[in-house]
Curated annotation (Swiss-Prot):
Organism name: Claviceps paspali (Rye ergot fungus)
Function recorded in the entry: Geranylgeranyl pyrophosphate synthase; part of the gene cluster that mediates the biosynthesis of paspalitrems, indole-diterpene (IDT) mycotoxins that are potent tremorgens in mammals. The geranylgeranyl diphosphate (GGPP) synthase idtG is proposed to catalyze the first step in IDT biosynthesis via catalysis of a series of iterative condensations of isopentenyl diphosphate (IPP) with dimethylallyl diphosphate (DMAPP), geranyl diphosphate (GPP), and farnesyl diphosphate (FPP), to form GGPP.
Name the UniProt record assigns to this protein: Geranylgeranyl pyrophosphate synthase idtG
Pathway: Secondary metabolite biosynthesis
Residues carrying the site annotation Important for determining product chain length: Y120
Gene giving rise to this polypeptide: idtG
GO BP term (any one): alcohol biosynthetic process
Entry EC no(s): 2.5.1.-, 2.5.1.1, 2.5.1.29, 2.5.1.10
Record bears the keyword Magnesium: yes
Keywords: Magnesium, Metal-binding, Transferase
Gene null: resulting phenotype: Simultaneous disruption of idtB, idtC, idtF and idtG eliminates the biosynthesis of the whole spectrum of indole-diterpenes reported to be produced by C.paspali, including paspaline, paxilline, paspalinine, paspalitrem A and paspalitrem B.
């Protein structure tokens, strides 16, 4: 039978085998048009550290949700996380993600946006498999939060407005905390436990983002995966950058470097040296240590209430995020 001119027959190659592998893991795929999911599949071919999946498993030691529901929730978070990365890389004009060229440099901006949008709705479709009637409302709530956070970060960059630390913290709670919270709120909705784990999740989300900001400017491993000091080239007001600018309000050098969105190696090295001269990396490390200590205290309180030993997996995640325990080069990036 000849291929239809309306429904072309696509070549079955390496990408198709990737989709089959993903499907075996329980991830939804689009059977009719493999090109629809190609950017998403490409990103999944270079998996990150999957810390969100690890956190879901760790919190489930307390919540005891049935495995089939956990798998569904992890699938939802995986789809949303990878979709958000596709969009982030376009908005930030990124060059590398996980050590390979970004998806839109391979498939084009339009197709990558469409693939990301499709993933949002594939994730939404998965909500039908959950028993909590509030799952859709939770999903909508946290996706709105995620876009609020992303919108504020983009606004600061485009208007060259340096936010306060308080404004930055609110942005992080929305942007980074959104998916962390979504996973745990969906878990809580499937659990018999009435204990609220969101405060600890919020601490972990903030810890993760500030650590990520630090790594972007200080980690050799991070540079290999995303490029040297990518946040400087993006003009991003990250945590150490905000502290550095506000440490010397009358000095416009760093602000002007961000304005240039420079890819020049020497300019970026100068920016890192300037940030270091204001004590901002030291300040950042102190904040990370403080958040890690607070998260450990929150976890200890939960273990005291729920029973010792349930927090072993969460403690392992905290060790991974702890700069002193893991070393500053440890990479937990997306």
């Amino acid at each position: 039978m000849a291929p239809s001119p309306i429904m072309p027959r696509y070549h079955v190659g390496p990408m198709a085998s990737t989709r089959r592998a993903i499907s075996k893991k329980g991830f939804p795929r689009t059977r009719s048009f493999p090109v629809l999911t190609a950017p998403l599949d490409y990103l999944r071919d270079s998996p990150g550290k999957d810390i969100r999946s690890g956190l879901t498993d760790a919190f489930n030691e307390f919540l005891c949700v049935p495995e089939d529901k956990v798998v569904t929730i992890k699938r939802i978070i995986d789809l949303l996380h990878n979709a958000s990365l596709l969009i982030d890389d376009i908005q930030d004009d990124s060059k590398l993600r996980r050590g390979v060229p970004v998806a839109h440099s391979i498939f084009g901006i339009a197709q990558t946006i469409n693939s990301a949008n499709l993933a949002y709705f594939l994730a939404q479709q998965e909500l039908k498999k959950l028993s909590n009637p509030d799952a859709f409302a939770i999903y909508t709530d946290e996706l709105i939060n995620l876009h609020r956070g992303q919108g504020m970060e983009l606004h600061w960059r485009e208007s060259l407005h340096c936010p306060t630390e308080e404004e930055y913290m609110r942005m992080v709670q929305n942007k980074t905390g959104g998916l962390f919270r979504l996973a745990i709120r969906l878990l809580q909705g499937e659990s018999r436990s009435d204990r609220d784990y969101v405060p600890l999740v919020d601490t972990l989300g903030t810890l993760f983002q500030i650590r990520d900001d630090y790594q972007n400017l200080q980690s050799d491993v991070y540079s290999k995966n995303k490029g040297f000091c990518e946040d400087i080239s993006e003009g991003k007001f990250s945590y150490p950058v905000i502290h550095s600018i506000r440490a010397r309000p009358g000095d416009l050098r760093l602000l002007n470097i961000l304005k240039q969105r420079s890819e020049d190696l020497m300019v970026k090295q100068y920016a890192v040296s300037y940030i270091n001269s204001t004590g901002s990396f030291e300040f950042c490390r102190g904040k990370i240590d403080c958040l890690a200590q607070w998260a450990n205290l929150q976890l200890a309180a939960l273990e005291e209430a729920e029973g010792a030993g349930r927090g072993d997996k969460l403690r392992a995640v905290l060790r991974l995020l702890d700069m002193k325990a893991s070393g500053k080069q440890a990479d937990v990036a997306s």
